[in-house]
Protein backbone atom coordinates (compact mmCIF):
# COMPACT_ATOMS: atom_id res chain seq x y z
CA UNK A 1 0.00 0.00 0.00
CA UNK A 2 1.46 3.34 -1.02
CA UNK A 3 1.43 6.63 0.86
CA UNK A 4 -1.57 8.11 -0.96
CA UNK A 5 -3.72 5.02 -0.45
CA UNK A 6 -2.96 5.04 3.27
CA UNK A 7 -3.89 8.71 3.53
CA UNK A 8 -7.16 8.17 1.68
CA UNK A 9 -8.08 5.26 3.95
CA UNK A 10 -7.49 7.44 7.00
CA UNK A 11 -9.60 10.18 5.42
CA UNK A 12 -12.53 7.86 4.71
CA UNK A 13 -12.51 6.56 8.27
CA UNK A 14 -12.57 10.08 9.70
CA UNK A 15 -15.27 11.31 7.29
CA UNK A 16 -17.61 8.47 8.23
CA UNK A 17 -17.33 9.42 11.89
CA UNK A 18 -18.05 13.07 11.05
CA UNK A 19 -21.06 12.06 8.92
CA UNK A 20 -22.51 10.14 11.87
CA UNK A 21 -22.41 13.37 13.88
CA UNK A 22 -24.26 15.25 11.12
CA UNK A 23 -22.32 18.51 11.50
CA UNK A 24 -20.60 20.93 9.13
CA UNK A 25 -16.99 20.01 8.40
CA UNK A 26 -13.92 22.02 7.51
CA UNK A 27 -12.10 19.98 4.85
CA UNK A 28 -8.43 20.62 4.10
CA UNK A 29 -6.48 19.47 1.05
CA UNK A 30 -2.85 20.29 0.44
CA UNK A 31 -0.45 19.93 -2.44
CA UNK A 32 3.20 20.98 -2.49
CA UNK A 33 2.26 24.27 -4.17
CA UNK A 34 -1.24 25.11 -2.82
CA UNK A 35 -3.63 24.53 0.09
CA UNK A 36 -7.42 24.38 -0.14
CA UNK A 37 -10.15 24.58 2.52
CA UNK A 38 -13.91 24.10 2.28
CA UNK A 39 -16.75 24.16 4.79
CA UNK A 40 -19.21 21.45 3.75
CA UNK A 41 -22.64 20.92 5.32
CA UNK A 42 -24.12 17.46 6.15
CA UNK A 43 -25.95 17.44 2.78
CA UNK A 44 -22.54 17.61 1.02
CA UNK A 45 -22.99 21.19 -0.20
CA UNK A 46 -20.08 23.62 -0.06
CA UNK A 47 -20.96 26.52 2.25
CA UNK A 48 -17.65 28.40 2.06
CA UNK A 49 -14.28 27.85 0.40
CA UNK A 50 -10.85 29.44 0.14
CA UNK A 51 -7.55 28.44 -1.42
CA UNK A 52 -4.19 29.82 -2.44
CA UNK A 53 -5.30 29.59 -6.08
CA UNK A 54 -7.77 32.47 -5.57
CA UNK A 55 -6.62 35.89 -6.66
CA UNK A 56 -7.79 37.58 -3.41
CA UNK A 57 -5.66 35.25 -1.30
CA UNK A 58 -2.70 35.00 -3.66
CA UNK A 59 -2.23 38.79 -3.81
CA UNK A 60 -1.42 38.89 -0.08
CA UNK A 61 1.20 36.14 -0.26
CA UNK A 62 4.80 35.84 -1.32
CA UNK A 63 4.57 32.05 -1.71
CA UNK A 64 1.48 29.80 -1.86
CA UNK A 65 2.97 26.61 -0.42
CA UNK A 66 4.05 27.64 3.07
CA UNK A 67 2.65 28.10 6.60
CA UNK A 68 1.87 31.79 6.05
CA UNK A 69 -0.28 30.88 3.05
CA UNK A 70 -2.12 28.26 5.12
CA UNK A 71 -2.83 30.86 7.82
CA UNK A 72 -4.27 33.23 5.22
CA UNK A 73 -6.52 30.51 3.79
CA UNK A 74 -7.70 29.56 7.29
CA UNK A 75 -8.62 33.16 8.04
CA UNK A 76 -10.46 33.61 4.72
CA UNK A 77 -12.47 30.39 4.97
CA UNK A 78 -13.49 31.15 8.57
CA UNK A 79 -14.65 34.67 7.67
CA UNK A 80 -16.66 33.38 4.71
CA UNK A 81 -18.25 30.60 6.78
CA UNK A 82 -19.23 33.00 9.55
CA UNK A 83 -20.82 35.31 6.95
CA UNK A 84 -23.00 32.36 5.89
CA UNK A 85 -23.97 31.64 9.51
CA UNK A 86 -21.69 28.67 10.20
CA UNK A 87 -19.77 29.03 13.46
CA UNK A 88 -19.19 25.43 14.53
CA UNK A 89 -17.50 22.75 12.41
CA UNK A 90 -15.70 19.43 12.67
CA UNK A 91 -12.12 19.49 11.35
CA UNK A 92 -11.52 17.02 8.50
CA UNK A 93 -7.79 16.92 7.83
CA UNK A 94 -8.25 14.47 4.90
CA UNK A 95 -5.76 11.98 6.32
CA UNK A 96 -2.92 14.52 6.49
CA UNK A 97 -0.90 14.80 9.70
CA UNK A 98 -2.01 17.59 12.02
CA UNK A 99 1.29 19.39 11.61
CA UNK A 100 2.77 22.28 9.69
CA UNK A 101 0.43 23.81 7.11
CA UNK A 102 -2.62 21.78 8.18
CA UNK A 103 -2.21 22.83 11.82
CA UNK A 104 -1.54 26.45 10.82
CA UNK A 105 -4.75 26.57 8.78
CA UNK A 106 -6.73 25.12 11.70
CA UNK A 107 -5.25 27.59 14.20
CA UNK A 108 -5.97 30.56 11.92
CA UNK A 109 -9.57 29.43 11.41
CA UNK A 110 -10.02 29.16 15.19
CA UNK A 111 -8.55 32.62 15.72
CA UNK A 112 -10.94 34.02 13.09
CA UNK A 113 -13.94 32.65 15.00
CA UNK A 114 -14.70 29.09 13.87
CA UNK A 115 -15.22 26.66 16.73
CA UNK A 116 -13.86 23.10 16.58
UniProtKB/Swiss-Prot annotation:
Superkingdom: Bacteria
Entry-linked InterPro entries: Ribosomal_uL18_bac-type, Ribosomal_uL18_bac/euk
MF terms in GO: 5S rRNA binding; structural constituent of ribosome
Any single Gene Ontology cellular-component annotation: cytosolic large ribosomal subunit
General function of this protein: This is one of the proteins that bind and probably mediate the attachment of the 5S RNA into the large ribosomal subunit, where it forms part of the central protuberance.
Self-association and partners: Part of the 50S ribosomal subunit; part of the 5S rRNA/L5/L18/L25 subcomplex. Contacts the 5S and 23S rRNAs.
Protein name, per record: Large ribosomal subunit protein uL18
Species, as recorded: Shewanella sp. (strain W3-18-1)
